[in-house]
Amino acid sequence: MVVNSDPDWLWRGTAEIFPHNADSNNPQEHLGILTQQDRPLRVKLGIDPTGTDIHLGHSIPFRKLRAFQDAGHTAVVIIGDFTAQIGDPTGKSEVRKQLTADQVKRNAESYLAQLKPILDFDTPGRLEIRYNSEWLSNLDLNKILELLATMTVGQMLAKEGFAERFQKENPIFLHEFLYPLMQGYDSVAVNADVELGGTDQKFNIAVGRDLQRHFGKTPQFGLLLPILLGTDGQQKMSKSLNNYVGLQEDALSMYSKLEKTPDRLLGEYFELLTNLDLAELPENPRECQKLLAKEVTAQFHGVAGAIAAQKTAEDIVTQGKAGNTDSVPEFSLAEITFPVKLAYLLSASGLCPSSSEGRRQIKGGAVRLDGDRLEDVNQEYADPKMLINKVLQMGKKKFIRLIS
């Protein structure tokens, strides 16, 4: 009888491992067994630095990568400085804008700085950081033709994103077909035993397995992780949808956003974003929200920073005060006409002298509502119910409570 020897950390928050033959004692067919062999595994995770910011959704595969590190394995982080100039077409309904080498370099530096609270950068042998331009920029035409010959156009068109664009007769450029092959060749170049990715990366990871087999190497395992829903509970976390929590956000902003996590997302967030025992969580959803906010904020700002953020958030929302301010003045929303622009509200409430100054403060990141930073200079509120009993803040010392 085969006993499931998978360690708990391997499956926590994991959507799928492939191949995963639970009836086999062969390590080459069972990642759980392979993780407990004598040699450390080489666990690959690639990122294309297409922007400067990482949010909690991006952090999930890196948290799993850290779990592999803590179990004694080697994390191989691939900075896709070459592939970022193409852009991953996965899930995209149109061609991605190509980046310059300088843009990619700056973005990569920002990404690595944000990952330091998550990954183990210090223990010898636990982390390799590689740039795929090391090998991809040296591919000659013969090698590129060899890669192209491993797949058919039909296989490529079956990929999510390509299929939709083909059906809608939207253009698909030939260089985009190279992306999965290049990501797959990364696995060949670094001798990956395991590749991590979101559930949307299964096609690309499977291509890596095929290419490793083509070049006479042992095919990697794929470990897929869920795509995190955003704080709205509706769509995947995304900066463009403004439902994200950025890793570079200050402690108060991070805490305030997470404290409002919808009840139905709490279990998922605890499983994917913390190491807490899920069986020991508070029964009260409100207490769960506070615990989640405090736990995640502490990962990036330390325990002291999380405690301070919690106290400030509670002072603003529940006690009507902030820091050393004993009370907050009130402004009646009945004095203005709705819909109302945020910039005008800042001026009408007396927090700033004019709407133009209000827009400048919003652009500068100085405006918050109940602790949440507001960044859209065109933000508009259609109904006073959206604002009643909330605290509007500008800078560190100016607060006003909005009442009916």
From Swiss-Prot:
This is Tyrosine--tRNA ligase. Its EC number is 6.1.1.1. It is found in: Cytoplasm. It catalyses: tRNA(Tyr) + L-tyrosine + ATP = L-tyrosyl-tRNA(Tyr) + AMP + diphosphate + H(+). It holds the Pfam family tRNA-synt_1b. GO terms for biological process: tRNA aminoacylation; tyrosyl-tRNA aminoacylation. It comes from Synechocystis sp. (strain ATCC 27184 / PCC 6803 / Kazusa). GO terms for molecular function: ATP binding; RNA binding; tyrosine-tRNA ligase activity. Residues 340-403 form the S4 RNA-binding domain.
